[in-house]
Amino acid sequence: KTVLHQQNILTGAVVSVARTVLGTIFALVTNALLAYIISRKRFLFRSQLSLFWVITMYVNGGMIPTFLLYKGLGLTNNFWVYVIPGMVSAFNMLVIRTYMNGIPDSLEESAQLDGAGYSTIFLKIYSPLCKPVYATVALFVAVGQWNSWFDAMLYNRMSSNLTTLQYELMKLLSSVTNQGTSAEEMKNAAGTVTPTSVRAAATILTMLPIIC
């Protein structure tokens, strides 16, 4: 009851659901398209691009340059900062590409003999066959989007209408945990909400949609 009656909890829940749905859809589409492109053996720079994306998995630009970049692009205090940066993931893209590499080339060649273009081959042949890996990647992205709170703190902390459920729960848990622990305060706190109970309630709220 204490958790659910906190300010901005409902707004945060709506934003979290929206970012999870939109972020998953956009990420799945872009990663699938990129994976299809670099899985084509006739694509000239497939090896170089694959190496480039692998490097980005281990080396990033750093927090401050990333913040300045997002600010310059107008993504601070903006809902799309939750969606656009996650549209391309080297890991997810390589997972889909590896799955596509296991699909026989004869299927694509037969479709080309029938006059099918690359878009038709991708939509009508590869996408139906890649449903298992699409579902896996979608689950990865959805769980990551739902559990994320750090980007809300960095980029949208000044906009209460763009807060997320996880960020609000984190602030609540921090405020309860940082309450005084002197003997007198502990005596006066009898019967009030404890950090452990808040942590348990927050855990249930964040896990329930994923479990369902």
Regions found by a protein language model. Name each.
Residues 1-212:
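A hydrophobic, multi-pass inner-membrane permease signature
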